[in-house]
Every structure is written in structure tokens, then in C-alpha cells.
């Protein structure tokens, strides 16, 4: 997969000059033949099959994030002008460290005895060896630079370069995960488990104390023991952090975290009125209440389901608000406050968020059950809750 990678890094410009920033240009070649390499080979591997051109760093953000952050599409020069010196320096250091890691991997791979069948394993072993001893020294800009390199490889439709960089990223994440508390490790495992039944089985084994298990493909998997309440609370904390931002950077991850929180709470067996699930809200969020009122006013069916799907995907009432706070324009804005009245807080509420919406549905259901109110409304809300989870399942995996 990887024969040689030659990396160049431009001279480090000062943030004030904002000269062209070049992250490591990678010259990748992947032409291993079936013949083995001799351990004591004296010549360096020189054949270069694919040249991956240099590219400028735009900050490691997607086009949507760049628009949110700078109010412009991905214009490289403008983005660099907007970067503050600390962020600019972090990018430089991160890029240099990616270069260093890949160079050290080459050193290990050059003298390895391998054939075409074992090259993928060899790359993974080299990544484990190099990153394992350097993970504690990783710069804050390392993952930002690596993510941007992967984005560009994907845009260039360069699967080999993308695959190599993803091996490095997965290895780094794996090492970082091992340093996390057990309930955080479990969330990482659940995010990579697409089948609902498998997630439930994983949660059961985690609640039982964890241990070593054999997966369907025969590989050994170590599952840590953790408290279900800790898992639900951690997922909820991550959700709150993501949902209070003006724009959601990754809706797929957001949907996975919502499912993890709801499934962990459901497995605790305390029901809707379980005090462990109480966030301590004194009032419910305006946007979610307005949207829920619309859904309850309509008969359950395809129309309501489509409304839920649109909002969960970030459309209609769930669309991210990228306008500035001081924008006086009222065109296209939805009314603030409950039922179109003025906002109680005087601030424009956030759009409808998946995690907060399900939290709102649960709170309203809890009030209905504790007050012995009409059963028809409760059934309607249960249906909304169920359909929302189905939609999030489709988005998440």
C-alpha cells in the first residue's frame, strides 16, 4: 500500500504576513509487487507512482463551517486572513507533526519484509508503533491538519491517500480512547455499532461488568465495564455542547449520540419519570415547544413524519441560523417565543435540535402521566417519540 512517502513543509511564515501556508505535500506510491523485500536492502525505494500535490490549509473546516465562521465560502486567502495567530501557529505545528509521523512510518516500512497481501497489516502496525510512543506529545492542530488532508484526498477521489491518512487517524483515536474513562470508551464503541440489537447487547455486557468477547468476524473485543447512568449523562453532555452551537458540525454524530442517550436511559428501566434523567429544566425551550405544538395539532401520519424528518435533517424549523446576532433583517425569520409571541428571554432561540426535542417530548409525556391527563395526547406524543427515533436511526447509520 505504501512504498515511499516524501514530505515537504514550507518555511514557516509569520501570522502577520499571511503568506501561502503549505501543509506537507505527500508523494505517495503504492506499487508493492508480490515479491518480498530483503531486510538488508541498501538502496532506498525510489519509484514514485503517485504525486499528491501541495495544498493550502483553509483551517481544517468544511465549507459550511467556513461560511459560519467567516461569512464566506472557502476562499483560502480570506480564511488565512481571518485566522488568529494562535490558531495559525497550531495549524503549522500540527502539519509538521503529521509530516514527522508519516516519515517515521516510512522508516519502519522500508526495511519490512512483506508482500502484497500483508501490506495493509504492515501499514497499520507501523502506525501503531509510531503513534503509540508519540500520542502524549500530539499538538492541538494535529487532528485539524489530518482531517483537512483527508477532506482533500476525498475531493481528489484519491482513495489510496485517503486510506493511508485514515489509518493514521483511526490509530490516534484508538490510543486516545484507551486513555478515556470507561463510559467514554463505551460511547466510542457504540458510535461504531450500526445495528440496534448489537448496541443493546453491548450495553448489557457493559452493565454486567464488561470483559473480553469474540465478535461476529472472529476478532477479540475488550469491553470495559461502566455505569449506564454515566453513559447516558456523558452522551447528554456531548449533545448539549453540540446543540448549543449556532450550527451543527456533524449531524450524523449528533444522531448517534441521541440514540446512545435514549437507549442507555431505556435500559436503566426507570421510565419517563426517572429522576436520574432530569436535567433540572424549569422551562422548556421555545423552538421545540412550538414545533411540538404543530405536530400535536395534526393527525399522525406521513405528513407529520415528513415534518419530523425535515427538522431532524436540519431543514425548516431545524435549519442552522448562520446570520449574525445583530442582523436587524426580519425577512425569513420564524417568530420567537411560544406560539409566535415575543420571546420571554428577549433573545432569538436556537433552531429545533434533535436531543432537546426528544427531551421536550419526554418532559411533556411525564407531565401527562403524572397528572392523569387525556390518553389520546399521550399516545400521539409516544408516536412522535417513536418516529423521531426511527428518523435518527436512518440519519445516524
From Swiss-Prot:
Organelle transit peptide: 1-52
Keywords assigned by UniProt, alphabetized: Chloroplast, Plastid, Transit peptide
Gene that this polypeptide is encoded by: PRDA1
A single GO cellular-component term on record: chloroplast nucleoid
Changes seen on gene knockout: Seedling lethality due to deficiency in chloroplast development.
Cellular localisation: Plastid, Chloroplast stroma, Chloroplast nucleoid
Protein name per UniProt: Protein PEP-RELATED DEVELOPMENT ARRESTED 1, chloroplastic
Ranges of compositional bias, category Basic and acidic residues: 315-334
Function: Plays an essential role in early steps of chloroplast development. May be involved in the redox control of plastid gene expression by maintening the redox state around chloroplast nucleoids. May positively regulate plastid-encoded RNA polymerase (PEP) activity, through binding to FSD2.
